[in-house]
Amino acid sequence: MPDNTIRSNSEVVLIGAGIMSATLGLILKELQPDIKIEIYERLDVAAAESSDAWNNAGTGHSAFCELNYTPEKADGSIDPKKAISIAESFEISRQFWSYLVQQNKVPSPENFIKSVPHMSFVWGDKNVEYLRKRFEALQSNPIFADMTFSTDFNQLKEWMPLVMEGREADEKLAATHMEIGTDVNFGALTRSMFNYLEKLDGVTLYFNHEVKKLKQREDKSWRIKITDLSTGQKRKAYTKFVFIGAGGGSLPLLEKADVPEGHGYGGFPVSGQWLKCTNPEVIAKHQAKVYGKASVGAPPMSVPHIDTRVIDGEKALLFGPFAGFSTRFLKNGSYLDLPLSIKANNLIPMLSAGFHNIPLTKYLIEQVRQSPKDRMKALREYLPTARSKDWKLEKAGQRVQVIKKGKDGGGVLEFGTEVINTHDGTLAVLLGASPGASTAVAIMVDLISRCFTNQIKTPEWEAKMKEMIPSYGKTLNDKPELLAEMRKHTAEVLKIK
C-alpha cells in the first residue's frame, strides 16, 4: 500500500492559532526574516478558543483593578510585587502592538483596543480598609501613580452611575479608578496578526489540522504527525523547534511529547459563563471595567466584574464570570479530555491538588447548581436595579488551571500562566490562564530568551528587539521618565488614553 503521507521541513512549528502563537511567530519573523514557520490549528479559523473576544474578559490586564494580584499578607500588609510585574508586562504589549500599527502590520488600532477606565469596587468596613491599603501600596509606585481612591458617594456615582443606582448614601463603599485602563479584543488582534503573518514568505498556516503525535528524534529535532480533519490526509512535519500554544489543548500535547520537563503536570478545567446585557439603554449608562472581590474559595479567574466591552465596533455589557466544571479542556473539546490526561506521572499531584483545594471544589459545585435567580442575585450586588429581562446567559471560554508537582511530591494548583521548556530549548509549551493574552508579548520574549539563547545575544537580534520594544531589557516602574515616555508614545499610536 503506497504511503501518501505529505512531508514537510521547517525551523519552527507553532501548534494552535491563538494570541500566543501569533505573537511568537511575528516576533521570530521580525528577528529572522528568512525563518521557515508552519502553524497548525485544529479549528477552521484563528483565535476561536481562549483568544476569542466572547471567550475572555477582554481586560487589558494591567493589575489596575484585579484584586487577586494584590494579596493581603498575614501581617495585614499588601504585597504589590505581582501587580507591578503584570503592569510592566502590559506596557511591553502596548509597545509591541504600537510597533505593529506603525509598521502597518496590523490595521487600525481601534479594531482591537479601546480606552475603558479600570476600577476596583468593594463594600463593607473590612473590604473598604483592604482597598485603602491596596491603593496606598500601589499608588506609591510610578506605574500606578495615576490611581485614585474614593469613598465619596458622589464621586463613585460620577465614576460608575449604573453601579450606584439604587444605593443609599450611608452605605460603606469604596472604589479605585485608573483612567488609562483598556478593553482589548484579542480575537480581532490575533486574526489581524495571522493575516499579516501568513502572507510572508516561509510561513504556512494550516486550518482543520490536528496534531496527533510528537516525537523527538536522536538529532534533537521533532517529528510531528498531523491529520487534515477535512480530508483525512496524513502529514509528517519535521522541525527544529516546537511551540505548543493550544490553550486548554496544550496539556494533552505536552503529554504526547513525553519530555521529562512535562512529567508531573496536570490540568483542572474550569468553564465560564457571562450574563450579557440586551438593553441598549442600560449598556449606554456604564463605561468602565469594575472588578470586585472574589468569594472565599473562588479561583482568581472568577473575580466578579461588570464590564464595558467593545466588540467588532459595538458596545456591550457583561457580568461574570460564573464558573462551572466540565471535563473538556477546550470549548470545542471532548468530555474525555480530563480522564485521558491522567497519567502515572501526574496522578498523585492531581489527587493531592484536589484534596488540598476543597474550598474550590465546593465553590464549583455551588456555581454549577446556580439557578437564574441565583445569578441575578449575584448581579444585583453590583447593579442593584438590574432586571432579569435585560440579561441573558452566554457561554464563555474554557480554562485549564495548571496542577504541578510540589516540593513534597503532592500537587499544587497554580492560577497563573506558565511556560515550560525542555533543557535543550527545542520545545516550549504554555499552560494556564489569567493574565494570559495581556502579557503574551512579555511571555514570548522570555520564551525566546530561554529557547533561542545564542541568537538572542547577537547584536542583530538585540537591536531588532529594541526597535519592536523600546524598553527591552529595562524595567519601567523604577524609571518614571522612561515609563511616561513609553505611555505617551503608545497612547498616541494606539489612540488610547
Swiss-Prot record:
Biological source species: Flavobacterium johnsoniae (strain ATCC 17061 / DSM 2064 / JCM 8514 / BCRC 14874 / CCUG 350202 / NBRC 14942 / NCIMB 11054 / UW101)
Q: Does the keyword Oxidoreductase apply?
A: yes
Q: Name one GO biological process term.
A: tricarboxylic acid cycle
Which cofactor does the UniProt annotation name?
FAD
NCBIfam families named among the record's database cross-references: mal_quin_oxido, PRK05257.1-1, PRK05257.1-3, PRK05257.1-4, PRK05257.2-1, PRK05257.2-4, PRK05257.2-5, PRK05257.3-2
Q: Does the keyword ATP-binding apply?
A: no
* Reactions the enzyme catalyzes: (S)-malate + a quinone = a quinol + oxaloacetate
This protein's source sits in the domain of life called Bacteria
Q: Name one GO molecular function term.
A: 2-hydroxyglutarate dehydrogenase activity
Q: What Pfam families does the database record attribute to this sequence?
A: Mqo
Say which enzyme class the record assigns. oxidoreductase
What the entry lists under SUPFAM superfamilies is as follows:
FAD/NAD(P)-binding domain
Q: Please state the Enzyme Commission number of this protein.
A: 1.1.5.4
Pathway-wise, it operates in:
Carbohydrate metabolism; tricarboxylic acid cycle; oxaloacetate from (S)-malate (quinone route): step 1/1
Which parts of the chain span the membrane according to its record? none
Name of the protein described by the UniProt record: Probable malate:quinone oxidoreductase
Matches recorded under InterPro entries: FAD/NAD-bd_sf, MQO
Q: Which keywords belong to this entry?
A: FAD, Flavoprotein, Oxidoreductase, Tricarboxylic acid cycle
Describe the family membership recorded for this protein in Swiss-Prot or TrEMBL. Answer: Belongs to the MQO family.
